[in-house]
Amino acid sequence: MKTVKKISGGESWNCTSLGNKSLIKGKINKWKIQIIKLIGSITFGIVPKGIDINGVNNWMKGYITCSGNFYKHNLGVVIKPHTISAGEGSILETIVDLEKGVLSFSMNGNNLGIFCDNIIKDIEYIPFLDIYNEGTEVRLL
């Protein structure tokens, strides 16, 4: 298991980690992260392969946890869909069905529902994670 910890860079979305393998087309792809230490905010989800790290916020489909509260982030639009909160020890799972074009998430085994059901199936996607606050630490499971 690998750990991602932001140790410098201040408060900014500048600690992006991108997956090194594309999601498998026509399959259900899943991966999990565990929050080890939550100082502030993280984002996690999927982005198109080959994206410029500086453009992640414009192209991401995923959640932002702002001090543990979940905000939906879909291609630059942010809304608050859930009243649940993540904290240290929480396990967050991303589930991508590239056959049906559906993206969903779970926290600690509890399904958070369908995030979106219109993923473009012809694009190659990779997992991503970004950390805003120094000291925040996440384990890749």
Would you name each region that the model predicts?
Residues 1-141:
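PRY/SPRY (B30.2) beta-sandwich protein-interaction domains
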